[in-house]
Amino acid sequence: MSIRSLVEAYNALDRLDLRVLRLLEAAHVRREYIPYGLVVRWAGRDEGAVGRSLSKLNRLGLIQRIKGPYEGFRLTFNAYDVLALHTLRKSGKLVSISPTPIGVGKESVVYSGEIPSGVKAAVKFHRTGTSSFIRARKARAFLARRRHLTKLYEARLSAHAEFAALSAVFDGGGLVPEPIAVNRHVVVMRYIEGVDARRIRPEDALPTARDVVETVEVALENGIIHGDLSPYNILVGDRAYVIDWPQWIPASSPNSVEALSRDIARLEEFFSGFNISIDKDRLINIIVNNKYKQIDFNNVYEKVLRSFIKT
């Protein structure tokens, strides 16, 4: 469903519709399909009103209905989009969103938007999970009991992981998009005007390399390794910004040196075309000599788990 269609669906919802969606979302932590009787009971409204709301939500493509031993309902991913947009709007984090995407990838879709201050924002919808935290023991255990939540949970975890990395690197002075808000599987950040590094002019190569290495160093000192750094993830405008952080890994991970080396190798390959070298040893020594902040590997996971339970 396009954002235009999502916004139209959202504008058609009333308070009861939103209440039913939130009830179904909360109930999904324990079961895939929620029986009709439970929805009516939890909604606290007469059966006719709840039934009409469910039919409306089904017609809008926000829920799926099954009929078998019992009549039940589950949310679609479109509903999570709507709920995230609703929460961001009601909390004053997002005013508007573009009808067409400005970036489409395998793991996410990005739209431009506007926050209440009038500042242009990038609104990133995570669609699949790329976070290394998905492989954490607690995450695997959570999903093993809730297979129906896998796609949503992984997208949500990736969004929160990216927001955590952006916050740490931005606060440390690194050149990344300023994080504004995260809700469910959606991250709102300040929009960066620029082009990816593959399109820079030769005279911009050296300042670009310096900015990127500086940001990599800030991230390392905060215990973070990008994990997928390449010219595709560098936006060059007034400065060079490193974007796309959901797959970051802690510097304390057993494979941290290997992951950092891969990032540096891709930078070396690109900047060698401009006769620019990267001081690989200095960056790796930050890990080897433990000159970084220790990150609790499960902290991001725990926040996402709590958000599921409290939804």
Task: Describe the function of each predicted region.
Residues 4-9, 48-51, 60, 64-66, ...:
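Conserved ATP-binding subdomain of kinase catalytic cores across diverse folds
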Residues 33-47, 150-176, 197-232, 264, ...:
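Conserved kinase catalytic-core helix
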